[in-house]
Amino acid sequence: MSEAARETGTELGTADIQTLLELLPHRYPFLMVDRIVEIDRDESCVGIKNVTANEPQFMGHFPDMPVFPGVLLIEGMAQTAGAICCRHIRADGRNTKQVFFMTIDKCKFRKPVTPGDQVRFHMTKLNQRRTMWWFRGEARVDGTLVAEAEISAMLVTE
């Protein structure tokens, strides 16, 4: 832990693709996060998605003007938030196996995302009660807000 982290009481971490594959159940073509560049305990997380023209959704959305589907931006937010939940589960040693996306509220799409963009998903925990977690999320490209939403997730024991 860095000196700054010790002084502020925060533990910043990252997760490369291998760690994400250990944390999240998602796989190609539905893994919407390439890397976690910052995790602050159970409070917030920043994930990135590098959007490429080779992704299967661009075959139909839209062939002559490829736009990354908004619903997949929300899924990227959910997966980024899921990394927080999964780290928490792992740290607690609980028998919880899955995190399920439950609700989307206050969702707005502001600008299109196209191949070549790098999306940064900024997720902040709003609340947690037992197995329910609530998050506020923003998706940004080059610092510009492209989508935002509030989502909730439930930790489910198998």
UniProtKB/Swiss-Prot annotation:
Superkingdom of the source species: Bacteria
Subcellular location: Cytoplasm
Pfam families for the chain: FabA
GO CC annotation terms, alphabetical: cytoplasm; membrane
Enzyme active site: H61
CDD domains registered for this protein in UniProt: FabZ (cd01288)
Keyword set includes Lipid metabolism: yes
Cited InterPro entries: FabA_FabZ (IPR013114), FabZ (IPR010084), HotDog_dom_sf (IPR029069)
Record flagged with keyword Lipid metabolism: yes
Protein family membership: Belongs to the thioester dehydratase family. FabZ subfamily.
Protein's recorded name: 3-hydroxyacyl-[acyl-carrier-protein] dehydratase FabZ
Primary gene name: fabZ
